[in-house]
Amino acid sequence: MNEDPRPIYTSLLFERNAAIEQQEARHQTLGYVRLAIVVSGVAIVWAALSSGKFSIAWAGIPIVLFAALMVAGEQLMRTIERRRRAARFFEKALARLEGKWAGTGETGDRFSDPEHPYAQDLDLFGKGSLFELLSTARTHIGEDTLARWLLTPATPEVVRARQEAVNELRTRLQLREDLAVLGEDARTGVDPVSLAAWGEAPALLGPGHMRWKLWLLTAFGTAGFVAGVLVGIRSIGLVDLSDVGAMLCRDLFLVSILVNGYFFYRWRKPIDAVVGAVEEAAHELGLLSEVLARLEREQFETPKLAALHVSLQSDGEPPSKRIARLDRIMELLDSRDNVFLRVLEVFIMWTPRHALAVEEWRSHSGTAVRRWLTAAGEIEALCSLASHAFEHPADPFPEFSGERGMLEAESLGHPLLPEDRVVRNDIRIGGTSPHVFVVSGSNMSGKSTMLRTMGINTILAQAGAPVRAKRLVLSPLAVGASIRLSDSLQGGVSRFYAEILRLRQILDLTTGELPVLFLIDEFLNGTNSHDRRIGAEALVRGLVQRGATGLITTHDLALAEIAEALGDQATNVHFEDQIANGEIRFDYHMRPGIVRKSNAIELMRSVGLEI
């Protein structure tokens, strides 16, 4: 599919904005009508009172009409709000296509971990990050899932399943729009961790033995209440009851209060715990139910999506029906605040019986809550990748090679840069090619960007997304990067020490199952040239011996000798600049060999420093 998404988004945004204008005009008209009803109602009542012919109908009819229009107005406002969400969905999509997306979406800062081997170095989270570019998820579970995929490489089998799912979802724009609109309600109101924990928590009430006890107590309490009523109405002569009968009814009434009251207060602590927990959980499930109901209606073809769709079902029953049952239980629980039910509470065991119903719901459906959340989160994450695929139809899915520790790319570019600014390079590293590229070059020539380009496309590839390349073939890789490091005054860590700690972390990665792709910028920049040369060669040699592949950049041309020392396992490449009419120009193309010039002095002169 190579259709340009821009006209599609533009057309749909126009439709949503037109619908908003139409519905806002209708809402304004409803406001005028409500005002007219109030004015006319007051006038009619005043006239009726003045004429002495007042009837409750004169006031009742305007009140009923006003209330009906209020309800209609609230429903219309909800529709308008959802249309606005849809419009924002397409506005953000167009902003991504125009390269103006940074700062408009969710940055994923809560996932940022300075100890992660590549998250900060490759701009995974934060303003202008990969997460902000990709994420269209509107629930926390969807964001959590997408972040986990970016932070943890999947196996080729899992990646291929995701690729198939993304390819199917990329054409389902209506589904992606609906999930973005419906998920907004669930965004701030649903905590997936606590909700799943509530569903799986041990039972606070024993459904088995309590059920018959509660029904016996309800029957006994009902009989006691009826007996008490009979005693009461006998006292005013409305029923003919013997003294013995009255005494028995009175005793039954008192005993039912004592017995039911004993059990009611004996069970009060676990019952209050059940009711307190379910109030929040039921609210969260209610917010999530529309998202789940929308997914229930969709029919999927690929195995991954079909399996997720099936996982929503529990014994053939969709989550919307199960959540609806819990909603009905909650409505009955909430009605205990009714004055009449407060009087009857102890007699009919209203709260205990419905607390038990909640526990029975949890025993049948509680363990499914995590499955619902997982399925919804995965589909939202897949929809995020599908939106990216839809918006970049020329970006292919990568292929996985059985060759260990290799990456081969044709026209590889940085996905966070606007398409008109991306400069692409070819590269083959690992396998039968050199395992280490020593990248030299002048300042601002593109060395660090090349490292990030390699890393971020590897992350996309192993998450299941398309990559910014004409073609990319790679083996499964564990990425370790040392690009963006800083000192810490509070932690007592210098930049150099922070770098060697990260290098230790990268070296430790080589003990895992996957071969390592290391990306090291300005190798050992915080020490003298002699120590840097010795340390760098030893570390690179150790990485290669452990099957690692990667790139290191440097300004120190002495480090270029590392490639010669490693023979066929390493090679030198460089980026360079051109100076024309006193201006420094970069083409950002990677070339073989060692750079032969520096631009530091020219850069200092360009900002007005006297050199």
PLM segments and residue spans:
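Alpha-helical coupling/stalk and coiled-coil linker elements that connect catalytic or binding modules
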Residues: 1-444, 449-478, 502
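ATPase nucleotide-binding head domains, primarily ABC-like/P-loop NTPase cores
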Residues: 260-263, 385, 392, 396-611
